[in-house]
């Protein structure tokens, strides 16, 4: 069996990125640039392929903790931390956009942020996006973390944080790991309870976005608020 010929330098991911831009590279090639080197018997691009296959694609890979990544033979602390940093940079880019823009006027940006923050999580998390009077992001804070099927959310904690940050409005988002993005009866009841609690301090609940993998559902758009 003949082995594949080595890539010409002009075909290396770094050289192609410099000539044609990052968008021309495949996912394994982009990962190869982040990883910089491969491991024994496996170059960086092959390692990228292997990681995507092992963890079920980019979302699964980038949602994996550094400790879980280090289980891969040859993938040490440095490479695992680089991959974790890549996801965090992507999330912070979207967060930066929310600081600058009206969240109500940019529902797609909100949806993408929620998906980036929660789509890969393996247990339920609930996050609150606290907004100022111009509906720009003040701070994003985790308000609950639970199990595979539920997270206990306390309206009083959300109200307290809204007062502390002088918020005028907020958006909630939580994930359904391994499920669908459809709002359950419990989701609807809790959301309305939180909306009523916030109304007492004159804070608007604009939306509650449910995330399941790549799917998102706006409870406001579905008439549940």
UniProtKB/Swiss-Prot annotation:
Signal peptide region: none
Keywords: Hydrolase, Metal-binding, Metalloprotease, Protease, Zinc
Domain MPN stretches: 103-225
Keyword Hydrolase in annotation: yes
Origin superkingdom: Bacteria
Short sequence motif named JAMM motif, residue ranges: 174-187
InterPro entries, A to Z: MPN, RadC_JAB, RuvA_2-like, UPF0758, UPF0758_N
Family membership noted in the UniProt record: Belongs to the UPF0758 family.
Descriptive protein name: UPF0758 protein BP1235
Organism: Bordetella pertussis (strain Tohama I / ATCC BAA-589 / NCTC 13251)
High-level lineage: Bacteria, Pseudomonadati, Pseudomonadota, Betaproteobacteria, Burkholderiales
């Amino acid at each position: 069996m003949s082995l594949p010929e080595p890539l010409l330098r002009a075909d290396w991911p770094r050289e192609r990125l410099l000539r044609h831009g990052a968008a021309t590279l495949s996912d394994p090639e982009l990962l190869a640039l982040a990883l910089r080197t491969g491991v024994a018997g496996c170059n960086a691009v092959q390692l990228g392929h292997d990681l995507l296959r092992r963890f079920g694609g980019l979302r699964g890979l980038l949602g994996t903790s550094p400790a879980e990544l280090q289980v891969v033979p040859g993938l040490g602390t440095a490479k695992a931390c680089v991959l974790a940093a890549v996801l965090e940079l992507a999330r912070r880019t979207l967060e930066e956009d929310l600081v600058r823009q009206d969240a109500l006027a940019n529902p797609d940006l909100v949806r993408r942020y929620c998906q980036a923050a929660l789509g890969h999580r393996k247990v339920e998390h609930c996050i609150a996006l606290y907004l100022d009077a111009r509906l720009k992001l003040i701070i994003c804070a985790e308000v609950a973390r639970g199990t595979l099927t539920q997270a206990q959310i306390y309206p009083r904690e959300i109200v307290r944080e809204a007062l502390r940050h002088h918020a005028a409005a907020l958006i909630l988002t939580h994930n359904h790991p391994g499920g669908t993005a459809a709002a359950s009866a419990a989701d609807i009841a809790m959301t309305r309870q939180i909306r009523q609690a916030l109304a007492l301090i004159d804070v608007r609940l604009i939306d509650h976005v449910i995330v399941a993998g790549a799917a998102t559902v706006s409870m406001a758009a579905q008439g549940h608020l």
